[in-house]
Amino acid sequence: MTPQPDSVVLDAKGLRALAHPVRVQLVGLLRKHGPSTATRLAERLGVNSGTASYHLRQLGAAGLVEEDTERGNARERWWRSVHQRTWFNDHELVEREPEAALAYLQSVAATYTSRTQQALNELQTMPRVWRDTFDMSDWPLRLTPEEASALYEELRAVMSRYRQDTPGAAAQAPEGAERFSVITHLLPEPDAPATSTGTDTGTDAGTDTDAGVERP
């Protein structure tokens, strides 16, 4: 499967630029909410504006965000995301930049965790109709690598059948449609022993991020 037109395929420079949780979150906020300033983004993340401004400049140098010159002025710079998705599946790059690759994935994982906590905090104030769609589950499986890859492709096929959250799709969405995010974690555990009890460990909830990693 190939990257979509609005995706950025991470190279070494982009990978190193995103190897920080604040930068992953900044890109996510710009993708989710549109152009913004360092001050406003800093308020959302709970950091000072100087920190946000520094990280935005680093992201800009890597080509992941850019100044929105139509909005900016001499007093305040506006920033926007250059892409809507992040594509990272370069095995050779991982071997060349193992520390940056790990730091990036750890940053993404931290962002997912933060978004999960945010969703949980918002759950009680959600309308009941949306609260009933909230889910957080896990299924321990015993698969071969080939079966795991097939599962991944099946999950992607299911997601592709639904309306994506893009500006064009949002304009044509039916009444009542809201942003709804799905995060998948496929976690190999090759050294885990076989379970003997057959206990179902499933739970129920759901998450969201805009700094997602895709792989073909």
Per-range role (PLM):
Residues G63:
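Glycine-centered, phosphate/nucleic-acid-interacting loop/turn motifs that mediate DNA/RNA or nucleotide
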Residues N48:
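Helix-turn-helix DNA-binding motif, specifically the short coil turn and the N-cap/start of the second
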